[in-house]
Amino acid sequence: MYPTWVEARPFMLGSAGGTAEVWRCGIGAVECAARTAGVLAARRPDFILLAGIAGAHPSVGLAKGDTVMVSREYAADVGTLREGRFIPLPVDGNDVKNNFYDNPTSVPPLFRSVASDTVAVAGTPVRAESAACIENMEGAGFFAVCGALGVPFAELRCISNYIGEERGRWRIAEAVGRLAEDVGRFIDAVREWS
């Protein structure tokens, strides 16, 4: 599953492209959650992968073109603004804030495992503090649906930019090319792992 056909196309045209079904989930957590739920209900896959590009925090040691496995997603921009400050909403009335979702699925350790912030606006300063190394726009919705329905899943992201960097400096073409190669490697490894 890919957010856009731009991200999916290199995989679909590559040598591994015929080895898996490919769906587009759309951009944003809500669109991704809705389309993921639809695919899971209609197709009932044994395993589902979300793959796309992401922005990295400049200080975490990731380079553009690095692919990472997301092990935790934070719904980082769910909260309120008070006096110019972002306040994450508490979960179920307790002190836990900044809803997060962990991936319990065991997968081959091919890539560095990181936490990610899911945000509606790339580079937004309106977010909760977290231990995330990267940001994307879909992951929390994907994690929530797959977790709720008990479907094994994984999320791969290839770094196209640094958070806050102007879009002209992003390396989207290089990132989606690398992502296609790494998705193929990951699919092969999952099949051997199973």
Task: Annotate each predicted stretch with a short phrase.
Residues 1-7:
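Gly/serine-rich nucleotide phosphate-binding loop at the start of the catalytic core
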Residues 8-194:
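Glycine-rich phosphate- or other oxyanion-binding loops that anchor nucleotides, phosphorylated ligands
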